[in-house]
């Protein structure tokens, strides 16, 4: 699966309709970005190995309190649910996790990250 295919799939999510999604760089203030997919190899406890593609989707947003943080977490949770229900053609979503922001930037924004792992079928 190509980066372009993954990017187009991500941008087709209803919650991103009309939003600009930067590819491989963070927006200055409020916005969305997606990292270039990284190929990962994992091994289970029995020694079986499989490959997947990992992408991080970042939501950078101005935050003034916990209500804002909860609203952003809901946005990412809805995107995670959509991704699991509508995986890219020929793939399945094997992991989808949301990371809490580590710190507030000088501009007053926080970065919330959704990590998706896609396994090609």
Segments (PLM) and residue ranges:
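Charged, amphipathic alpha-helical segments and their flanking helix caps
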Residues: 1-25, 38-121
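A short, hydrophobic beta-strand-centered structural micro-motif
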Residues: 30-36
């Amino acid at each position: 699966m190509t980066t372009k295919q993954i990017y187009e799939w991500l941008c087709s999510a209803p919650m991103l309709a009309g939003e600009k999604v930067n590819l491989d760089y963070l927006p200055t203030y409020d916005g969305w970005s997606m990292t270039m997919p990284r190929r990962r190899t994992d091994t289970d406890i029995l020694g079986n190995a499989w490959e997947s593609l990992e992408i991080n989707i970042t939501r950078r947003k101005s935050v003034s309190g916990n209500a804002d943080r909860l609203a952003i977490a809901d946005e990412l949770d809805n995107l995670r649910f959509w991704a699991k229900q509508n995986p890219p053609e020929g793939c399945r979503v094997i992991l989808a996790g949301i990371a809490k922001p580590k710190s507030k930037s000088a501009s007053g924004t926080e970065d919330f990250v959704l990590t998706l792992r896609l396994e090609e079928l």
